[in-house]
Swiss-Prot record:
Gene behind this protein: BUD32
Keyword Hydrolase tagged: yes
Biased segments, Basic and acidic residues type: 140-152
Assembly mode: Component of the EKC/KEOPS complex composed of at least BUD32, CGI121, GON7, KAE1 and PCC1; the whole complex dimerizes.
Lineage top rank: taxon: Eukaryota
Function: Component of the EKC/KEOPS complex that is required for the formation of a threonylcarbamoyl group on adenosine at position 37 (t(6)A37) in tRNAs that read codons beginning with adenine. The complex is probably involved in the transfer of the threonylcarbamoyl moiety of threonylcarbamoyl-AMP (TC-AMP) to the N6 group of A37. BUD32 has ATPase activity in the context of the EKC/KEOPS complex and likely plays a supporting role to the catalytic subunit KAE1. The EKC/KEOPS complex also promotes both telomere uncapping and telomere elongation.
Domain Protein kinase: 8-289
Gene Ontology CC: chromosome, telomeric region; cytosol; EKC/KEOPS complex; nucleus
Cellular compartment(s): Cytoplasm; Nucleus; Chromosome, Telomere
Protein family: Belongs to the protein kinase superfamily. BUD32 family.
Official protein name in the record: EKC/KEOPS complex subunit BUD32
Keywords: Activator, ATP-binding, Chromosome, Cytoplasm, Hydrolase, Kinase, Nucleotide-binding, Nucleus, Phosphoprotein, Serine/threonine-protein kinase, Telomere, Transcription, Transcription regulation, Transferase, tRNA processing
Chief subcellular location: cytoplasm
């Protein structure tokens, strides 16, 4: 039996897709309890830390040897990408468990709201079905949703209200996102699935600021080699804004502005050129179907 099996059995399934299942646990291991001799009372030594377990389950349509190799490679790169990002100052979940054989990676559970929720895109479902995605640089596979949904604006989300109470505007939030993405791309890592659902806002009482942006779900991350790799990453986020958050052009412009400032003109220029090319290809695909 794999070491991760008991952990998965204790978890609650919160997301399911073609590549992986995600479970939530109140803690990685049962909370230790200390007993005092001569006393009937006891207390826990430490508060439990909620965790997330992502299980890349076996794909029966692949040869077992190939499946095991791909699962191990993707799991290892995800863990290393998170470590590199954290070292570079990008706020990401802490990795607390890696079981390559079972295809399981464990991370701290981020308490807060997704940027999607804050901007009024709605909360993700309790169990979300995700379309299978492969790690490819081809923009046509990364920017699938071309329709812009025109939806009426609803009431302010709980997260947005909390930020407003701290004096934080949507513009401040966009700048924070741009700065976080610049730090990530400086490490030569691309996220691979940049959406507002994969960005969390966590309040930080007593910290250097009232909140922080936490980038999550690095399952499709990869090593960047060319400016176009970064441009595709940005374009995926641009399309996510357009499809989930109507009339958000100014907000995304704020993300790009701060991103460019964080990278510096020398690094930003070639990415900017490629981003324009990627947009043109995306528009052409929309028109031709």
């Amino acid at each position: 039996m794999a070491a991760s099996t008991p952990l998965l059995s204790r978890g609650t399934l919160i997301k399911q897709g073609a590549e992986a299942k995600v479970y939530a646990l109140p803690s990685l291991f049962p909370e230790p309890t200390t007993y005092h001799p001569g006393s009937s009372s006891s207390f826990s030594a430490a508060s439990p830390t909620p965790v997330i377990l992502k299980h890349r389950f076996t794909k029966t349509y692949r040869h077992p040897t190939l499946d095991a190799s791909l699962t191990s490679q993707r799991l290892t790169f995800e863990a290393r990408a998170l470590a590199r990002a954290a070292k570079a100052g990008v706020t990401v979940p802490k990795v607390v468990w890696v079981d390559e054989k079972a295809g399981v990676i464990g991370m701290e559970r981020i308490e807060g709201w997704s940027v999607r929720e804050i901007l009024g895109g709605g909360a993700e479902g309790e169990v979300e079905v995700i379309e299978e995605q492969e790690i490819e640089e081809d923009v046509e596979n990364k920017a699938e949703d071309s329709a812009v949904r025109e939806e009426p604006e609803g009431p302010e989300s709980e997260g947005l209200k909390a930020l407003k109470n701290l004096g934080v505007t949507q513009e401040h939030l966009m700048r924070s996102i741009g700065a976080a993405l610049a730090r990530l791309h400086k490490t030569m890592i691309i996220h691979g699935d940049l959406t507002t659902s994969n960005m969390m806002v966590r309040l930080t009482p007593g910290g250097s600021g009232p909140y922080e942006i936490v980038l999550i779900d690095f399952g499709l991350s990869s090593q960047a080699q060319f400016p176009e790799n970064y441009a595709v990453d940005l374009y995926v986020l641009e399309r996510a804004f357009a499809s989930t958050h109507p009339r958000s052009e100014k907000l995304y412009a704020g993300v790009l502005e701060t991103y460019a400032e964080g990278l510096g003109e020398k690094k930003w220029k070639p990415i900017q050129i490629k981003l324009k090319d990627v947009r043109r290809r995306g528009r052409k695909r929309d028109m031709t179907g």
